[in-house]
C-alpha cells in the first residue's frame, strides 16, 4: 500500500526500525513523499540481514525531478515503490543476490557499479548497468545459512540474549526452559535486536 506523507509534518516519523519518512523524500526538496509499505519492509529485511546501515540515494521522485535527471518515463520511483540504495561495506553483487532470494518471482532489481535499485512492482524485472542498461535473468547465488541448535545457542549467547550457553546445549529442555528462552528472544527483538 502506498502512503502519502509530508516531509515537514512527518519527516522524522519512523516507518520501520531503521527508516524515516525523510529518507524517502525526493531529492528536489519537495514536501510530498509517496512510500509503499512493502518497500519499507523489503529495505528493513535487507538492513537486518546485513546488519549494516543503508543509505537511500533516491526513492520517491516527482515527475519534474524524474524528467530533470532523465529517469525512465514509467519509473517505479514516481509511484513510491522504488529505492536506490547503498548498503555500507557490502558489494552491490551481494545485495542483489540477497534481494533475488527475497523476491525470486517479482519486484525489480538493478545492479549498478556503486548502488542497487530495488522496487516492489508485481512483475519481475532484472538488469545491470555498466554504461548501458541490459536485462539479465537474475542474480542467483545467495543461500540461507542453515544453523544447528548449537549454532543458534552460540548466536544467542554472543548477542547476550542468554548468559549460560552450556545449559542450553545439553539438549534436554523442559517446557519452562523453552518458555523462558522464547521470552528472552522476544524481549531482545522488541528492544531492536536482530
Positions of predicted regions on the chain:
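Short, charged/polar surface micro-motifs in flexible loops or helix N-caps
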Residues: 61-65, 90-92, 166-171
